[in-house]
Each structure stands twice: as C-alpha cells, then as structure tokens.
Amino acid sequence: MESRTEPALPPPGWIESSGRRLACRRRAGRGPTILFLPGYMSDMEGGKATALDAWAAAEGRAMLRFDYGGCGASPGDFEAQTLADWRDDTLAAIDSVEGPVLLVGSSMGGWVMLLAALARPRRVAGLVGIAAAPDFTDWGFSEEEKEKLRRDGRIAEPSPYGDQPYVTTHDFWKSGESLSLLNAQIEIDCPVRLLHGQRDDDVPWSLSLDLAEKLRSADVQVVLVKGGDHRLSREEDVGLLIATVTQLLERL
C-alpha cells in the first residue's frame, strides 16, 4: 500500500504591529489568501484550521494562520486582551499579506471577521463563518453574569472543551459591547457563507439567520447542519467547510 505523505508545515513566523508580536504560519500559494480566525480561547493549531491548511497545501493555495495576542504561541496576558485588540491583530494579519483575502472565522472569530471586513472592505473578498457569534457579549451572558463582571471584573466558568476555565474579563465584555453589530444593517457587500450546526448548545443557529438578514450583501448563504454541534469538527463537517471555501474561491 502506498503511504500518504502529510504536507509540510509552514515554518513558524511573526507578525509585528503596534508593539505586538503575533505567532503565525504562512503558506505560499495562489490567492486569495485564506486567513483563519480562531474562536475564543482557541488558536491556530485547532482541527479546522490545520485541516484547511492541509487542503491549501494540496491545492497550492495561499493561507495564513495566526494566534491573537495572549493566545496560543503569541506572547501576552490573555486576561489583558479585548475584542478590539483581536480585531486589530486581524487587521495586522491582513496587512501582512498582498492581495485579497478570504476570512474564515470560527465562533468569536466570526465576529472578528465581520469587524475586519468593515475595516478593510477593499481587501476582504469573501467571508466564511462557522457558528459565527457576533454580539455574544450581549446575548451570551445573563444579567446576573453581567452584573458580576461589573462588580468583580471577571468571571470564570468550567469549559466543556478543556481543563482551563472559561474566563471573561470586564474589559473584554465592555469592548464587545462597544463593537456590537446586530442592531443595524452591517455594511458588508462581499460574498458570505455561514455554516451552523443545529445541535449547537453555545450559539443558537437562528443567529446565523439573523446575521444573514442584517448583512447588506446580496450574496449570502446559510447552511444548517442538522446533527452538527458548535465546533462542527466531525469529518463530514470539515469536508463541508472545505467544499464551501473551494466553491467561494472559485467565484472570486
């Protein structure tokens, strides 16, 4: 039986911007460059990001993965970060490559990709959201939790995805509240694809329908995965993600 060779990892590198150093892995290839945006408390070595990178290697596509400040291999205190910081990190990543980019945002990364597309409309050619979670600092917290954030400055809860507690600071929450999007039309005109599992216990799939309505773009599609959970990390889910990225790149 012929063995299958795994694609070589791009060497680790750095994006430098405004005194921040962001760990990254760049893969050369034809554009638009795929830029993966992780979710909260995640990093560029997650399963969807690495699977997409392996596909990009096989197809000769350009891809950039990176870690927000304070996450993964990027230096910084996680609890000192805000949503605005991670938006700016994403803009620095966009500015570090040439030509158009296709943003792929998972969960909170879906919120960040929208903010980045608003800030760089001429650079962002398309968006793919995976359980995109804009405005989660509003709908994702009870009034009691919001009051605790104001009073204590942070909350820490058990995470279903790992041993580390799920920590939110008041500064992050306040930053998110200042960057809310769903209360008005979102002035994004590029093609958008939104994937969402109907068994998502963290972000209701109806949010992707609401987001589709708010986007100004006429080219928006929502795909609901009946058995999919929040992560959409099963083999068939990753296959759907890759197919979606492939089809969108062919249109750009």
Which residues make up each language-model segment?
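Short beta-strand element of the alpha/beta-hydrolase
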Residues: 31-39
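The serine-hydrolase catalytic nucleophile loop
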Residues: 40-53, 206
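N-terminal cap/lid segment of alpha/beta-hydrolase-fold proteins
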Residues: 1-28
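Gly/Ala-rich beta-loop-alpha elbow adjacent to hydrolase catalytic centers
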Residues: 105-113
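Short beta-strand immediately N-terminal to the catalytic nucleophile in serine-hydrolase-like folds
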Residues: 103-105, 130
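Conserved alpha/beta-hydrolase
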Residues: 53-75
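Catalytic nucleophile-loop/oxyanion-hole region of alpha/beta-hydrolase
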Residues: 71-97
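The alpha/beta-hydrolase serine catalytic core
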Residues: 8-9, 123-225, 229-252
